[in-house]
Amino acid sequence: MEKNPIKYIEFTNSAAKKIKSIIKEKKNKNVKLRIYIIGGGCSGFQYQFIFDEKINEDDILVKKLNICLVIDPISLQYLHGGTIDYLENLEGSKFIVSNPNAKNTCGCGLSFSI
């Protein structure tokens, strides 16, 4: 398990604060936000977020403000150099992925191609 690979992927203070808030609501300090990639969407791949207690031996942990983001090595290949942010506006609230590896993204921003 590799810890703090900041050079691989980052998440903003806004994302860290929202993750911390959700974990507090869940009343389970052992959960961590996991981001992973699945096939699907209009562009071929989709970002998925879940709160997970399990950390696999080969998972990568990114820490910020005492919060851990968990990424499996295969998903990291698609997210390398990216940033996870959290945005709240009139349209709603959501985690946003800025992915420098995505050649195309769909209008909703949830699917991409490489």
From Swiss-Prot:
SUPFAM superfamilies, alphabetized: HesB-like domain
Matches recorded under Pfam families: Fe-S_biosyn (PF01521)
Bound cofactor: record note: Binds 1 iron-sulfur cluster per subunit.
Needed co-factor(s): iron-sulfur cluster
Amino-acid positions noted as binding iron-sulfur cluster in the UniProt annotation, renumbered to this chain: C42, C106, C108
GO BP, one annotated term: iron-sulfur cluster assembly
Gene3D superfamilies assigned to the protein according to its UniProt record, in alphabetical order: HesB-like domain
Family: Belongs to the HesB/IscA family.
Quaternary structure and partners: Homodimer.
Function description: Required for insertion of 4Fe-4S clusters for at least IspG.
Database matches in NCBIfam families: iron-sulfur cluster assembly accessory protein (TIGR00049), PRK13623.1 (NF010147)
Name used for this protein in its record: Iron-sulfur cluster insertion protein ErpA
Originating organism: Buchnera aphidicola subsp. Schizaphis graminum (strain Sg)
